[in-house]
Amino acid sequence: GLYIFANRKTYAWRYVYPGMAGMGLFVLFPLICTIAIAFTNYSSTNQLTFERAQQVLMDRSYQAGKSYNFSLFPAGDEWQLALTDGETGKNYLSDNFKIGGEQKLQLKETEALPSGEHAQLRVITQNRQALNQLTAVLPDESKVTMSSLRQFSGTQPLYTLADDGLLTNNQSGVKYRPNNDVGFYQTVNADGSWGDEKLSPGYTVSIGWDNFPRVFTDEGIQKPFFAIFVWTVVFSVLTVILTVAVGMVLACLVQWESLKGKAIYRVLLILPYAVPSFISILIFKGLFNQSFGEINMMLSALFGIKPAWFSDPTTARSMIVIVNTWLGYPYMMILCMGLLKAIPDDLYEASAMDGAGPFQNFFKITFPLLIKPLTPLMIASFAFNFNNFVLIQLLTNGGPDRLGTTTPAGYTDLLVSYTYRIAFEGGGGQDFGLAAAIATLIFLLVGALAIVNLKATRMKFD
């Protein structure tokens, strides 16, 4: 960037560079990261590197030996640690020390503990992290550390790491090896095959294309994926058709010369576009409330029905389309209002002389002349609604949920919200690798559909 703005030879690139840099930073970089994650097992159980996961396992310990009740006694600005053997009743006391950092305290047997009040549980809780770093050495040279808010116990490392990478459980004797195919330390059977037990946390490894076949072979993922894909396409197509139809008709009405108060109507019809969409969506969520919403109250009073907008798949999808049409028609109306100005009045005068009516004018003159320049914008609208995450997340959160799936999926989920739920709301853990694979497929699908639409449009109008 500095070279482009400092060198005269690259003067022309100064106007292109900000856009290219923004595209690289906000489009290409996230896309590359998403595709890279799709080829790994990155998930809530496999987030760490191999070295970090190994260190977490090596830091684990188990209780071995006696447990002692402990107390802290204030000694001016310092403290004394007292341990009591619950079996023999013997007391052990340390010298004065200050809390903070790793310390070894030599304890001596004593007949009586210091007089005065010992530290309350609140003080111990506040200093728990520092107390965990204390090692108390008893007269027999045995060492104990804090095991709970009331006790010090003898502890030993739970695992021992051999030079060949073999991990041994010191408590049970079970041996584990790193399985780089799944990203876990896993038990090894006598015949050298992998056992069933895995140690958590796991670590991130590359698994190649494994996430992509899961979308098509796992029954619990395959069924909702294809159903959600079909619904996503239907939703996007319906949204484009309805917003264009409503926007075009309203644009023709407010451009009607005989209509009085056209300016007021235009302002009122454009208002939904002026209100932030997330506010409108939340307002509609309240209006469609099944028990107290104004829409159901009105339908009940007029027709005696109360549709289950959020629990029935069909009515929930209808609600989604209705709300999205409300949010999208002002944009199409504004576009059509501008395009109508470009249609010569001579065409309508000539059709009037031939005896054509309003409907003939609309379908024979207005619609053909508007639809061609609108086509690229309709394709853009289709692509936008294909990934309309905000609408689904705020209005239905994907519900009502589908039953019998291994991933969280709902009847109103679009592919993008389905991907989000897999990544962040999975009941069996967050599966970022699978979500990234689905996101990659969505990218390819949207790109392919856009190319097909553009080619079909070009063939139609050439």
Task: Map each language-model feature to its residues.
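Membrane-topology segments of multi-pass transport proteins
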Residues: G1-R14, F39-P224
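A structural signal for multi-pass alpha-helical bundles of membrane permease subunits
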Residues: Y15-V16, G22-T45, L167-T168, G173-S206, ...
